[in-house]
């Protein structure tokens, strides 16, 4: 386990990955007097606009990654993306650099095969039935015992890249090709999962502290398209027994991974209403995109919770501020420079907020912002967030 950080302030935090989630982490850290260095593979990443220092490096190059960390010697290294030279983090940790949550946890969770084997085989958590394949023929052979359809994902990818639902043998070749195109790194391996018919997908934001109990945010329901988050709402309605089961599994897996910080732990609820089975899906050792809703729905957002946890600061209470919802704002076209229309229309309703991430360019389906809303109930909150997002248009700058 990495050492707990000291109580000395100000602290220097290095973000490995500087997207919209990293930007909110940077803002939360700066409010506590921290110095932030934002690192990413391209200039103009969202967190770079609010950072004290900026570095642009090939994030999957271990030598470049080690060099930038050694040059700055930050108090904490906080990975915020999955496309990283994760093996370099273990070497840096051995030199006394604190990696959040730990280098080992980061490496395990950035590979679907490692986190799935940990959850299912080692910890005995309920997961979808699964197998691995290293070729199109192997994919077909792995899928047959699971029953069609199956879900195919590269073992290393991010933001839903390379995922597909395979309905039968005729789809295997295209699914294999999509997985190879969307994979991160040089590996070709895919995970083949049974297709779960679930009533609800949730993210349970789980806060592990250096000292003190593991804490949980109210569950977040969410919908995905193309393997990527589209909307979320909090709190998601679920039974007490199901919530307790999810919390127990989240605590078990995060305790095994160790370290401190916020983890986004994903589950499916499957089965008849009132007696659903809770099935572990995935885990991210950092703030989660579905958790953007906490910016309006909680007294402490997931980003504030992450920063407090990694700095060893108190978290007296996590309180819901009411029914909250989010809806992403997507680009529909490619633009080298971007502008937005409809901003005023998006903000006409009370208890509605808009975040535009400041990404320098656009491409179809790229997430450019998010609308947030509070409502009297889940339906109203989701309706307001959907309406606000629908007002936005991403155009050429």
Description of each model-found segment:
Residues 1-105, 109-110, 114, 137:
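ATP-binding N-terminal substructure of ATP-dependent carboxylate-amine bond-forming enzymes
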Residues 207-209, 268-272, 357:
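Short beta-strand micro-motifs enriched in acidic
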Residues 212-213, 271-277:
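Short, solvent-exposed loop/turn segments that connect beta-strands within catalytic domains
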Residues 108-203, 207-226, 230-253, 389:
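Active-site nucleotide/adenylate-binding loops and adjacent lid/helix of ATP-dependent enzymes
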Residues 308-397:
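Peripheral (often C-terminal) accessory segments that flank ATP-dependent C-N-forming ligase machineries
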Residues 276-286:
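A short beta-strand motif that forms the metal-chelation/ATP-contact edge
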Residues 244-265, 284-336:
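Active-site "cap" helix and flanking loop/linker of ATP-utilizing ligase/carboxylase catalytic domains
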